[in-house]
Amino acid sequence: MRIVFLGSGEFGLPTLKRLHEEHEVQAIVTAPPRTAGRNRKPRMTPIGCYANEQHLQLIEPENINDPEIVSRIKSLEADTMVVIAYGQKLSSEVIGDHFGINLHASLLPKWRGAAPINASIVKGDKTTGVSVISLAERMDAGLVYGTSVIDIGETETAGELHDRLAALGPDLIIDVLTGDRAYVEQDEMLVTIAPKLSRKDAQIDLAEDAQILARKIRGYSPWPSCHLEISGIDCKLLRAIPNNKSGNVGEIMEDGCIAVGKGSLQILELQPSGSKPMTWIDFCNGRQVQVGEKCEAVQ
């Protein structure tokens, strides 16, 4: 099967590798290199790097809907278009007559949008999964060809869930491409939206419930990441669970938990500014954190 693959993030890599092994990937379309890091040097997307490593045809348009790009894609005469975390909306001209499918990181119609993995943890879902849908002009609104479901771990972060969901993609995509392509329509009455995130979304208020705060910390880890100032140090919170013990909001209690509006937070893992990730116990021992110290949310 001749395939054009469109993707930019690491989420699509496992599926792309499988498609390259079992089918003919005629071209890979990805976002152009962007400046990143302290040196501000342009960096290719993970998908672009893989294309170069495998000597596959690579297209990196600023605008996928540019007529020249559309014409170039059509000239490939591919059988199928597979889209995973590409980052641009595709016009009907791009989709054309291809049998086109998209791998989305939720059980649609729940969590349409740019941040479904984060939303599933932050909102307290017990299960999630991936969906393979047809390409549609409305965001994530296509016909559902297949799904794969997993449970969300009690201490699982968005980064960890991302990797587990990405690993579900290859088998499901292959099943859809080689199967009978039966589908179901999405129920528009059940649609929920997971909009694109910003750093502001991860700002926390210690007056909130410990259950809510723990989900935010895990759901926004590793990015955009919740922060607290602890012993005068800006700390990125990576993993936490709620505790029923209560105290004065923001204070570190005798058991090491941080008192919040309802209950307390047990920080399991954090990353102080300028340091590597570490456990809460290692942080407290190294910084000589004292019971009764006050923590402040970083705005």
Task: Describe each region flagged by the PLM.
Residues 2, 26-31, 37-46, 50-129:
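Active-site-proximal cofactor/substrate-binding loop regions of enzyme domains
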Residues 188-299:
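Internal anion-binding site segments
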